[in-house]
Amino acid sequence: MPADYTSTARALSLPMSPAESLSPAEEDTRPLWSHLASSRRNTASPSVRESTGLRDQVVNQATKMLRRTKKTWRRLTFWQRIGAIGAALLAILLGLSFMIFTGQVFFWLGPVAEKWEQSWLAFFVLWLCVFFVSFPPLVGWSTFGTISGFIYGIWKGWILYATATVLGSTCSFIVSRTILSKFVNRMMERDKRFAALALTLKYDGLKLLCMIRLCPLPYSVCNGAVSTFPTVHPLMYGLATALITPKLLVPAFIGSRIRILSEKNEEMSAASKAVNICSIILTIGIGVFTGWYIYRRTLARAKELEAKERADIRRSLEADHAAHRPHGSFSEDPDVNTAATTLARDEEERIGFNDFDDDNVDLVIDDDSGSEISPNLTKKQFPGPYRDEFTDNDSDVFGDGDGPDSQMFRLHTHVRSG
């Protein structure tokens, strides 16, 4: 009984927080349930932490998106809200109609596919369709790729799809940049996130562009969005699109399998049908997983490059402030310098530096007679701002008397107008 009482009392006296490891003698005196609870807690904690962390990330992202949506909604006027609701309903209707149309188009193409396969006019018309859907906000790029494979087979359809995609995306990039030039300049000067993303393309621009092109993003919208980054050149964007053209084999392959299933459905055995259907499903799954994985890697790489760029700018700002010299240009490229300057303003706010002119406030001190100093004083009368820099040879400013009748001191300090 005393032994049980002693072990129970010792177990109850253990702290709630994780304690240091006990000696072997003390470990033997711990009750059995203490060992079981400790082992169960240590075993379950990694998975619990992982699931909790993933759940928290999803909840945080959803909360941020909801908060941003509410904030944007409150800023809209009455008619803007009506227009937003109408645009959302129209987008839903167009999406449903497009899904229905996509399902029916292969039934319509079945009887004419063999005839169109030998027609160069049909080849050119389909090529133009792929070319023009590269311009935002048109849709149907993936559907036309599947149709190319359906009519011309995997390899000829891929050639049609790839060439039209490369030329169309490059032309869309150039046109979008010309039309959206004012929007680009405004975004570069005001939006720090936009400036940061533009600077990330300065390091491994071609590699990051290829990753962006492989992401499952709306094709035409992506062409217009990337064109707003001034650090991306049209030829580089066209080269990145050409490098990822093997990805376009996926819709062409799916289209060719659909034609085989539609034409030889009665002649094919159940095993052949299963192989074709499974190949389509597997190809779609590989494409979705690859796009999702590359999308995650692209975001991670963009964050890494942004952190590196911010660190370089922060070091430059701290060095300039320590040496009491003005900030120079960050790059000889004007577009890169504009983006870096926007990011530098954000870093100055984070660090606490302020070099704005509104911090230099002129204070006018009147004498007893009420006379005021004219605002048109020359720099010759007052050669420079007042500085708190004294040496042993300086006299006491408070012991020299009042000095002139009135003085104006330029104080480098924060003064808020009352």
Swiss-Prot record:
Taken from the record's topology, the Lumenal segments are: 1-81, 141-157, 256-273
Q: How does it sit in the membrane?
A: Multi-pass membrane protein
Q: Which InterPro entries does this one have? A: Golgi_membrane_TVP38/TMEM64, VTT_dom
GO CC terms, sorted:
Golgi membrane
Known function: Golgi membrane protein involved in vesicular trafficking and spindle migration.
| Notes on the domains | The VTT domain was previously called the SNARE-assoc domain. As there is no evidence that this domain associates with SNARE proteins, it was renamed as VMP1, TMEM41, and TVP38 (VTT) domain.
Name of the protein in its database record: Golgi apparatus membrane protein tvp38
